[in-house]
Amino acid sequence: MDVADWLRRLGLDQYEAAFRENSVTVDLLPNLTPDDLKDLGITLVGHRRRLLDAIAVLRRF
């Protein structure tokens, strides 16, 4: 799995460029915080919530 695939599966592929430009890798995903997501330009609360829920799943593995 790569970050672009993960974002596409979440229906949030519009953020692929932001994650790529900020060198966010699969290894970094579990460490992202709500503030990190805001810094990446994810301003919609629902999108941040969806990402944080998916990040929580990654933390379990």
Name every feature range the model reports, one short phrase each:
Residues 1-21, 26-61:
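Sterile Alpha Motif
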